[in-house]
Amino acid sequence: TIAVTAEPGTGRDPWPKDKKMHAEWQLGLSVMNREGEFSPTLYHPVLGEKNSLMNVGDSLSFSFRYTIQKADWYAVLKHTINDIYRFTDFLRLKQTKYSLTQRLYDMHAYLTNDSTSKWHNLVYKGVTIGAQDYLGGVYDSEKDAMKNSDYGAMWMLAKLTDDPRLTQKRLPNALNFKLMQQHAEEDFLCGSSAGQYYLYKSKRFTEEWGPYTEPIATTYYMLMDMGNILLFEPQQKELKQHVKLAADRLLEWMKPNGQWEVAYENKTLKPTFTDITDLRPTFYGLLIAYEILKDKKYLQAAIQGADWYVENAVKKGHFLGVCGDTRFVPDFATAQSAQALLELYNVTKNEKYKEAAISTAKIYTASVYTHPIPTSVVKQVKGIERKDWEISQVGLSFEHGGVAGSANHRGPILLASHAGMFVRMYRLTKDSLFLNMARAAAIGRDAFVDFKTGVASYYWDSMNNGAGPYPHHAWWQVGWITDYLLSEISLRSNGGITYPGGFITPKVGPHLTYGFTSGMVFGTKADLIMRPGLFKLDNPYIEYMAALNEKEKTVFLILLNNDDEKQTSLIEMDTKCLFSGKKIRVKNVASLNNQGHSTLVDGVENWNVTIDAYGLTVLKIKYK
């Protein structure tokens, strides 16, 4: 492999002083030189851009280096990221005042407030459906669009908190929304998704960017969402029939070679977007159908679809996105493909799917910003002093790229759905770039979080504006943060603490849902729980998850140090928060290290815990 890399500092600084300069174009890259030969080429300055107007006799120079290595492209990319652009140094700069765990609890409060989360219940065809306002652009909308995002996270948060505002008021109407979202007429579209959005003024479902139906939308809004609900409510026989309808529709649409069309026009039912190919993980819906319905025909079809996908997408490095407003330029669906292939490997044990998953994850690292090098230079953001690293784009992935993608004018996104998947990839490969990228995306992003709600902005250039027109994004944030933390817990405990993951969430990336069944904490079964007020920590670098074995009267407090230095925290427990209307008393507490070895701890109300850099400790709390 041969590469050419500009010296750090040649490209633009997206926020050099006190305003966004993200679109300033100072460096051009090409795989073709001026003679039309295949050769990595840099251009600086870019014609028509800054410093490109020069007089006779003027000179300008810039520094670059060639890299030649007897290895593939990925090895050279890693060298550039780690050795030239010093990616790993970023984690040493990071600081935080707001833990990811606290964000989960604050978003729980935000999401259960109908006013702040913009939740509405409406009657559609005699059925009460519930969803959140969506104030972005939607085809034919009159600012009346409604949407639900992460059904897995909705059911997960309801299960973990046992909050009646969710279990009794939200979930039944969200389920109705999902059932009514399925195209019911017995025709060419039967079983498919009628559209992501509900328009309450015209009382109909619609797609974001036009009157068409995509097969992958059936994978997303039917099979992923319904599959995740059924993990929590397997007794829902009617819902299984809806899953079968959706899966059979995908089967009908699949071509003999395992391929799908990108979309069909709703009126003519003819294929549309015929100039592009469905290089997306549409096959994953059939894998879900197999796992839910246990019918081998769905697994065989999923394998056929995946085989086509591996040959035509993964091996060629060609991918399509899922955002119609940018005509499907590559986006976070690439990361979903990695997780989908990994799950197919887990079911079939066919090594080619594991290798394809790893290959796809490697390709997705190129969707993560790794420049410019973060520093401690002080900058101004909306009148507030911020160090450069606080607002750095490094470690964040884009929503979509290409000439039409939001990466060009908005920068990357804070919705780090890929973080948990990258931790899993590190466990598989021991490739530290995956782990460092996961942590760079997740940790120390305070400058982008609305501290009143715990919700991070979606786009980088929104800084800490919060949810804005996208209140449903909080569900995705609950989902990806939980997936990331549980993936770190599994990694740091060497598999001693594991919780089964559910299915991928639609659209924004590969994060999984949890909590539908018990996990294991060093040999003991325990259910994940969230109880506001149960634990109080005084160190925001320490993240935690809690788990309960009610039969053995044991609470596990699983603690993570998410810093590159040793950290200490005082932990207080308010026992009355564990069970509503039921008093308990702590008998004894033991501290378990990352191997599960136990040491008794003094105290029954509060404890001081010290955890090594990126380490794990578990408090095993016995009560009566």
Identify the function of each model-found stretch:
Residues 100-135, 165-189, 237-261, 296-320, ...:
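Long, well-ordered core segments of solenoidal/helical folds
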Residues 149-164, 220-238, 280-295, 336-350, ...:
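Well-ordered alpha-helical scaffold segments within catalytic/enzyme domains
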Residues 177-304, 310, 314-321, 330-333, ...:
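Extended amphipathic alpha-helical coiled-coil/heptad-repeat regions
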Residues 366-414, 423, 427, 433-498:
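CBM-like carbohydrate-recognition segments
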